[in-house]
Amino acid sequence: MSVERTLMLVKPDAVRRNLEGKIIAHVQEKGFKLVALKKLKLTKEQAQQFYIVHKDRPFYDELCEFMSSGPIVAMVWEGENAISRIREIMGATNPEEAEEGTLRKLYGTNVGENAVHGSDSPESAKVEIPFFFSRLEIVE
């Protein structure tokens, strides 16, 4: 096992419903350390840049529109196998298919408004974390 860092976003749908505290507590209760946190609102251009890997997918425009529709909470979590374990905690992309007790099952409403985003690989985390946080903003 290795200690990893991963990015997690609380999406606008969950922020609108004031769920960020519950989501943070849920992840902390699983033993992860929160090493960076900020609330911000992406412009559509920033959302397009962040999700550039999906630019050829049919949902890209809708995703970018949604992610720039309201505030988000960006976080960096640290822990053993954080990337895969936090993805398990988040659950399947579609809340209807997510396991009971996962964040998306608890707080997602549909495949687009599914409450959270998380890095899907070490390579993604290396790109996604610095998109939102400078080294000075990540507390050891």
From Swiss-Prot:
Keywords: ATP-binding, Cytoplasm, Kinase, Magnesium, Metal-binding, Nucleotide metabolism, Nucleotide-binding, Phosphoprotein, Transferase. InterPro entries: NDK-like_dom (IPR034907), NDK-like_dom_sf (IPR036850), Nucleoside_diP_kinase (IPR001564), Nucleoside_diP_kinase_AS (IPR023005). It is found in: Cytoplasm. GO terms for molecular function: ATP binding; metal ion binding; nucleoside diphosphate kinase activity. It is an enzyme of class 2 (transferase). Gene3D superfamilies: Nucleoside diphosphate kinase-like domain (3.30.70.141). It catalyses: a 2'-deoxyribonucleoside 5'-diphosphate + ATP = a 2'-deoxyribonucleoside 5'-triphosphate + ADP; a ribonucleoside 5'-diphosphate + ATP = a ribonucleoside 5'-triphosphate + ADP. One of its GO terms (biological process) is CTP biosynthetic process. GO terms for cellular component: cytoplasm. The active site is at H117. It comes from the Bacteria. ATP binds at K11, F59, R87, T93, R104, N114. Its main location: cytoplasm. Its EC number is 2.7.4.6. Its cofactor is Mg(2+). Major role in the synthesis of nucleoside triphosphates other than ATP. The ATP gamma phosphate is transferred to the NDP beta phosphate via a ping-pong mechanism, using a phosphorylated active-site intermediate. Belongs to the NDK family. PANTHER family: NUCLEOSIDE DIPHOSPHATE KINASE. Homotetramer. NCBIfam families: PRK00668.1 (NF001908). This is Nucleoside diphosphate kinase. The gene is ndk.
